[in-house]
């Protein structure tokens, strides 16, 4: 998907025309219109939003902020997931339901209990998580799915960084 210059749904549909299955993605809504696709959300994106909302300064011994609690829920999921790496996809699927589903249920319950200011960093994190909820548990459906799309993003990073560097190169050799 990284080869497309635009995020128009038509370009995604043309690229994925006969594909049926799971697509790991960030919060881009264009994937929602594709038929035969199960969108798998990225917990690293939700975690990042909560990290961005953590206050820069906090008194020693102060209770955890809501942003820290949100980040900690995400960290717990990643910690559990790390322990499941060596399992077969079938066993990973079973263990996720056993170990991660209760954490997810607690996270969503906690998230719904929050009242936040929409424009604040915490408000943005909470709104993003709430909006992505329909896709965030889809990784539980198949042990081959990942909890994040970090691997894909790391694979395309050289091209996304290079895109600006190559902007004024007139030939591939000049780039």
Residue ranges and their predicted role:
Residues 1-175:
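Catalytic center-proximal scaffold of phosphoryl-transfer enzymes
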């Amino acid at each position: 998907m990284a080869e497309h210059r635009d995020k128009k749904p038509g370009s995604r549909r043309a690229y994925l025309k006969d594909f049926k299955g799971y697509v790991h993605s960030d919060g881009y809504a264009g994937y929602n219109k594709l038929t035969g696709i199960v969108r798998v959300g990225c917990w690293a994106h939700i975690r990042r939003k909560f990290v961005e909302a953590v206050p820069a300064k906090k008194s020693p011994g102060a209770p955890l902020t809501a942003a820290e609690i949100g980040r900690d829920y995400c960290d717990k999921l990643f910690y559990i997931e790390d322990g499941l790496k060596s399992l077969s996809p079938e066993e990973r699927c079973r263990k996720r339901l056993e170990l991660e589903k209760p954490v997810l249920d607690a996270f969503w319950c906690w998230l719904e209990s929050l009242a936040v200011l929409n424009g604040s960093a915490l408000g943005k994190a909470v709104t993003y998580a709430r909006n992505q909820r329909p896709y965030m548990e889809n990784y539980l459906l198949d042990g081959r799915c990942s909890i994040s799309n970090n691997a894909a993003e790391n694979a395309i990073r050289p091209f996304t960084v290079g895109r600006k560097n190559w902007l004024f190169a007139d030939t591939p050799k000049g780039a």
